[in-house]
Amino acid sequence: MINYMIPKGFLCCGKHVGIKKRKLDLGVVYSEKLCSAAAVFTKNKFCGIPIIVGKENIKDNKLQSIVVTSGVANVATGEEGLKNTYRILNKLSCELNIKSENILPSSTGIIGKQLPIDCIITGINGIKSSLSKYNWEEFNRAIMTTDKELKIKSCKIGDATVLGIAKGSGMIEPNMATMLAYFFTDASIKAVELKGILKRAVDKSFNMISIDHDTSTSDTAAILANGYVGNVNLEVFEKTFTDMCIDMAKDIVRDGEGVSKLIEATVMGCSSFESAKVIAKSIINSPLVKIAIYGSDPNWGRIAMAIGKSFEDDVDPLKIEIAFNSNVIYDKGKIYEENFDCIERYLRDNNECKIQANLNVGDFAATVWGSDFTEDYIRINSYYTKRK
């Protein structure tokens, strides 16, 4: 049963072409009309070949298709990797009868392996007949690696629909945007406006999450607007779209490798938003904080340590307040031991835990989302390449 709304004019599919042993590993989305488009990419300097090609293809802010391979990242693959990406685009452009430069490529998976290109080219044969407006779950499965759950969201904005598909559960600390997020809308939005909307939404959502403090080589977030239903109120569109991005970002954290709890850290009372964000990220990226949350341990000292090691000028221990779910445990040098038991129960009984820190030096705040560390995270990542 489909429990999401589908924008007009978009078709998709997910196929098994032989990159993985059995699972779906090739996803394609196609618009019946050329779209205005925008995309943001990883800032990792060791980026994947599809990122290099994608940056070129998005320069004119027009796309008509997205193609994603999963299982092999096509990173550190040199000239052969570049040729393979162009072979995929050229083959798909012939099958869909569109320009290859209007296709955005992505790959996710193991770094340092070449794509099994012959299998992929064979799998693209006749792919247009596999496209359907109902195949979004198959597309989502085709782009997944260690994900456990589908990540599909949709919303209505006037007459227009926005559909979002994402993957990502490890190597997650986007800095733009392994995290992939694609959005499709039948609204008519000019490219220059779409670029601003996407960047601002990503900055408030995907760039505010972290699972393991590693920025992937392949992160991509893109939006395509084909204009089927006409104009929308851009202010309403941006707010609704941003809220959807935040929900999807939190879903990525919840589905993170070995994650048992989502951590929401809010740092307020800072002299700037950037300072608040740096300190909040320092909290959720601390292995000791993550492990304490996993063990339901109200170890506020680890939070204090994480705040201090941010090296931000805003940090003054005699002004700071630290709380769990608004239960204060430290305030300007005073420790509230009487709150330990209720905080411990809160951490034990909830799979989403809120940490607040008020630096009391300004008016700016930032909220970020992270996860705990469990034994499963180590198990999953200690033999990742051996499973492939």
Curated annotation (Swiss-Prot):
EC top class, in one word?
Answer: transferase
- GO BP of this protein: L-arginine biosynthetic process; ornithine biosynthetic process
Gene3D superfamilies, alphabetically? ArgJ beta chain, C-terminal domain, L-amino peptidase D-ALA esterase/amidase
**Alphabetically ordered keywords of this record:** Acyltransferase, Amino-acid biosynthesis, Arginine biosynthesis, Autocatalytic cleavage, Cytoplasm, Multifunctional enzyme, Transferase
Q: Which residues form the active site?
A: 178 (nucleophile)
Assembly description: Heterotetramer of two alpha and two beta chains.
Protein name, as recorded? Arginine biosynthesis bifunctional protein ArgJ 2
Task: List the source organism.
Answer: Clostridium acetobutylicum (strain ATCC 824 / DSM 792 / JCM 1419 / IAM 19013 / LMG 5710 / NBRC 13948 / NRRL B-527 / VKM B-1787 / 2291 / W)
